[in-house]
Regions:
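Acidic/His-enriched low-complexity segments
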Residues: 1-249
């Protein structure tokens, strides 16, 4: 018999509210795992010894709380209720009302459930299987990619950065801001870091990104809006046809 859960306990307490997320994720498509770091700029709305956020199927490595870029001298512990997918972050001393940065390092698995940050694949133009990492956060699965206030009433700005192999391509909600093609060098590969512009304030379930063997067309302007078409490597001929049709609009 399945355990009966209290619906009210799925909701987060209202003592803290996020205003911006700075997210950095590094997926490894070969082993289907990812490492991540999120900095949540938040407002503590009442003096608190605990903050609760949503987490599901993530391993939490470190948690730091800063005020004005200075780490607080306040012992931190945490525990995760896997049934309710809520992590309670506990402080030795109460945190006064104010603005803070909550910085969390974590890791996870690229699942095959089409939920959160997951692994998928497709056949390329040569019939070879290609791997991708992509997202499906609606309605409450952003918590499987990064710790967050995963309720739609919380509207925040999102700054996304992705670390990936140089031969891969990625997109997110906003346009690229900066690309460092030599972000990290190892014995057998060089990784790049792609930073995206800030989004408008929005709910967590609207955040999206995809990483894989893709290419992008040149930007075209359609009725005042700049558009690109993202497509698998080797499928460019179809994009040329599509762009010719778009230009007829």
């Amino acid at each position: 018999m399945s355990k009966l859960l209290d619906k009210k306990k799925f909701r987060l307490p209202k003592n803290a509210s996020p205003s911006k997320y700075k997210i950095e994720l590094h997926p490894d498509l070969k082993v289907k795992t990812f490492d991540g770091k999120v900095e949540i700029l938040l407002n503590i709305l009442e003096e608190s010894k605990s903050i609760s956020i949503n987490v599901a199927e993530l391993e939490i490595k470190t948690i730091v709380l800063k005020e004005n870029s200075t780490e607080l001298n306040n012992s931190i512990s945490w525990n995760i209720d896997n049934d309710y997918e809520i992590m309670s972050i506990n402080f030795e001393n109460p945190i006064p009302i104010g603005e803070y940065s909550l910085i969390i390092e974590f890791s996870g698995v690229l699942n095959d459930k089409l939920r959160g940050f997951y692994h998928s694949s497709f056949k390329d133009h040569n019939g070879n299987i290609q791997s991708i990492a992509t997202t499906q956060f609606e309605s409450t699965d952003a918590r499987r990619a990064f710790p967050c206030f995963d309720e739609p009433e919380y509207k925040s700005v999102f700054s996304v950065s992705l670390v990936l192999e140089n031969e891969l391509f990625c997109v997110s909600n906003a346009a690229e801001k900066n690309i460092n093609n030599e972000y990290l060098k190892t014995k057998d590969k060089t990784l790049k870091k792609v930073e995206f512009h800030d989004t408008i304030p929005m709910s967590t379930y609207l955040v999206a990104f995809i990483i894989g063997p893709f290419e992008a067309s040149k930007e075209i302007n359609v009725n005042g809006t700049n558009l690109r078409i993202i497509y698998p490597v080797g499928k460019g001929i179809y994009v040329i046809l599509l762009l010719s049709l778009v230009n007829m609009l």
